[in-house]
Swiss-Prot record:
GO terms for cellular component: cytosol. This is UPF0434 protein FTM_0733. InterPro entries: Trm112-like. It comes from the Bacteria. Signal peptide: none annotated. Pfam families: Trm112p. It comes from Francisella tularensis subsp. mediasiatica (strain FSC147). PANTHER family: PROTEIN PREY, MITOCHONDRIAL, ZGC:162634.
């Protein structure tokens, strides 16, 4: 995924910065504990597509 995209994308719910999870191909919002999938190199920023994360999972992203 193009890292310059991270400079403009934010969480659609709270507008927080997102963290790239290369291994799982997700963009993580630590504030809302959500992981937005990246499919075929395209971030899917739909709330209904996001996966709820545990606090332990969120902590892996710094």
């Amino acid at each position: 995924m193009d890292h310059s995209v991270l400079n403009v994308l934010v969480c659609p719910i709270c507008k927080a910065n997102l963290y790239y999870g290369k291994e799982n191909q997700v963009l993580v919002c630590k504030a809302d504990k959500l992981a937005y999938p990246i499919r075929e190199n395209i971030p899917v920023m739909l709330v209904e597509e996001a996966k709820k994360m545990t606090l332990e999972e969120v902590k892996k992203y710094g």
